[in-house]
């Protein structure tokens, strides 16, 4: 890499914030291997028909690329509201470049110096990273041994720390655990600020597992965040969104950058929503593959967390890094994340899962 003639100049020579010194950026490996099962992507690409429709939409949008996009993303927000249901309207919806930008805007608006964000870990690793990036104090509360959130302990933690933002992830990443609505309600009733229910994997929930969308009318401090990266198989589009009281949307508009959602992004996302039935048709297949994987892992002596997502957390391994590397050596990329002794695998195609099963048995000496 070029040093532009300044030999020896490094990040340490920059006026970096003290709390960022020595930190590492987020990064999941991006490798070309037989089975990519590490970032919880939907393994099924869009159909040729949808690819063509997206191409047409992008071409139509390109005609006006000399102009800024719709700053409010009005049509997209209405389409997202229609998809969500639960009486949600465009005024209740906000969209951004991936759900991470949604979470960042929430912390920009409600966090910052002198404010706290509280989460129940192990959980989504970006929550504390985004908190740090917005100079929000992060408070970590441990989950139970089975990766649940104890409602009484959670309420006690909220009352003790008085956070401006509480993060609840349901289904939880990396464990796959979904929260009962009663737990969310108890925390929402106790919280002095907003409660963000991160539902990135909501479409993969098992039958009977509720969404916090049903709480929005009762609890105006509840925010439900979603994404089109998982069930919608649109990770490359970078489209996240939330549903909340209109006052929350008004607050986020104070911190959003102008014209933050490009014309092309809006056009592609709108097209994907018109093909929602087709895109979501793979969800049932992935659920069935997930449940079969859970049964297989348990039958082979592994400990497995119940999952309502498109991934499975399994263990336990005295040296999980060695198992991870053995799998990678066989062309299978999973994720070394979450509590020690555990690994996470994304649910892929039947062919990818067959490769994973064989590789795992070899890696653990059970072949």
From Swiss-Prot:
Single GO molecular function: pyridoxal phosphate binding
N6-(pyridoxal phosphate)lysine: modified positions: 230
EC number(s) recorded for this UniProt protein: 2.6.1.9
UniProtKB keywords: Amino-acid biosynthesis, Aminotransferase, Histidine biosynthesis, Pyridoxal phosphate, Transferase
Keyword Amino-acid biosynthesis: yes
Cross-referenced Pfam families: Aminotran_1_2
InterPro entries reported in the protein's UniProt record: Aminotrans_II_pyridoxalP_BS, Aminotransferase_I/II_large, HisP_aminotrans, PyrdxlP-dep_Trfase, PyrdxlP-dep_Trfase_major, PyrdxlP-dep_Trfase_small
Membrane-spanning residues: none
Catalytic activity reported: L-histidinol phosphate + 2-oxoglutarate = 3-(imidazol-4-yl)-2-oxopropyl phosphate + L-glutamate
Pathways involved: Amino-acid biosynthesis; L-histidine biosynthesis; L-histidine from 5-phospho-alpha-D-ribose 1-diphosphate: step 7/9
Nucleotidyltransferase recorded as keyword: no
CDD domains: AAT_like
A single GO BP: L-histidine biosynthetic process
Cofactor dependence: pyridoxal 5'-phosphate
NCBIfam families attached to this UniProt entry: hisC, PRK03317.1
Family (UniProt): Belongs to the class-II pyridoxal-phosphate-dependent aminotransferase family. Histidinol-phosphate aminotransferase subfamily.
Assembly with partners or alone: Homodimer.
The protein, known as: Histidinol-phosphate aminotransferase
Taxonomic source organism: Thermobifida fusca (strain YX)
